[in-house]
């Protein structure tokens, strides 16, 4: 399988959201993408999310949590990530419409991203479905090397571009060294050249 890349252009991220919003499952697909690029959770962890992971009952009312907490399936490490106000709103807009009955019953033991293709019972979206959703939208946006892992890489890349220290990004991504993180988030020669050319000593 080819190596996927982060989405480095902010306008392309906006275009991805526009493309993902189309169709019967548009709101679900946009939320999957939005949580992915804002938390760095791997696709297996995203798809395993249940309503109880993002919602809580407070004073007999359901509300969105301020952070996500889970044990990563791959590393078995605990991971706690804050949810931005915008992401909290996006989650609430989705669940209050898509899962209105469960919200009314305060029944939070259901998958956030449930598949519609199951024969009885409830299952989350599969990793293959997740891959198709993201990679297909990427092709429509003119992004050829895109997959579900691109969301995690996009998170790291834009933190780096926004001036967040490499050591902190390494910690957020659970990497063993800064060098691995640099390669992972797609810092290439052009980025290094730009950094040096701006020095002007």
Residues of each region from the PLM?
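Alpha-helix N-cap/helix-start motif at helix boundaries, enriched for small hydrophobics
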Residues: 32, 44-49, 169
């Amino acid at each position: 399988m080819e190596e996927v890349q982060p989405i480095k252009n902010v306008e392309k991220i906006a275009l991805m959201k526009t493309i993902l919003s189309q169709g019967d499952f548009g709101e679900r697909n946009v939320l999957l993408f939005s949580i992915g690029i804002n938390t760095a959770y791997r696709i297996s962890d995203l798809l395993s999310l249940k309503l109880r992971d993002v919602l809580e009952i407070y004073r007999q009312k359901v509300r969105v949590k301020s952070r996500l907490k889970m044990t990563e399936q791959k590393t078995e490490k605990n991971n706690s990530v804050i949810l931005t106000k915008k992401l909290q709103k996006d989650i609430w807009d989705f669940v209050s419409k898509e899962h209105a009955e469960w919200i009314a019953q305060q029944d939070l033991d259901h998958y956030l991203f449930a598949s519609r293709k199951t024969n009885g019972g409830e299952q989350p979206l599969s990793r293959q479905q997740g891959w198709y959703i993201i990679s297909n939208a990427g092709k429509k946006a003119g992004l050829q090397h895109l997959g579900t892992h691109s969301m995690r890489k996009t998170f790291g890349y834009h933190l780096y571009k926004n001036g967040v220290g490499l050591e902190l990004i390494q910690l957020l991504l659970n990497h063993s060294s800064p060098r691995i993180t640099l390669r992972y988030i797609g810092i290439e020669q052009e980025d290094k050249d730009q950094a040096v050319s701006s020095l002007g000593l």
